[in-house]
Amino acid sequence: MRRVLFAVLAVVSLFTLPPGRAGLLAAAELQPLEIASKSGVHVFAVEMAVTPEEQAKGLMFRKQLPEGQGMLFDFHREQPTSFWMKNTYVPLDMIFIRADGRILRIAENTVPLSETLVPSGGPVLAVLEVVAGTAKKLGIAAGDRVAHPIFNSR
């Protein structure tokens, strides 16, 4: 049912999003990701950052990020990492995720344009960036499980 809903939303967004809007992701580039928390299952549409170039740029220079969308950074192996908000205009929640899909740590409401490092707090396979306030609003916390093909598939 969630996949059908996601497909319908993706098609609708193709016709409702204005062309050429910086910061909005094309529906064809988005993949579904689910987070199971105590408050329920939350579905996101994520853009993948898998190459070093994609990861270095991340969400830099974008002026907006719609609720329910995000960027998933896949490091291909577990490792400690740090992020920053240089050239990033949208405040974010950074969700650090282990290879088993469990959330290790959440850095909430990161400061736009800050060059202060935001550490993972341990080895992670991926980081999910979403609009600031999302984790608190949805009750997402450390220990919650993330479902996406990159987890437990290696």
Give the positions of each predicted feature.
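Compact, glycine-rich, soluble single-domain proteins
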Residues: 23-154
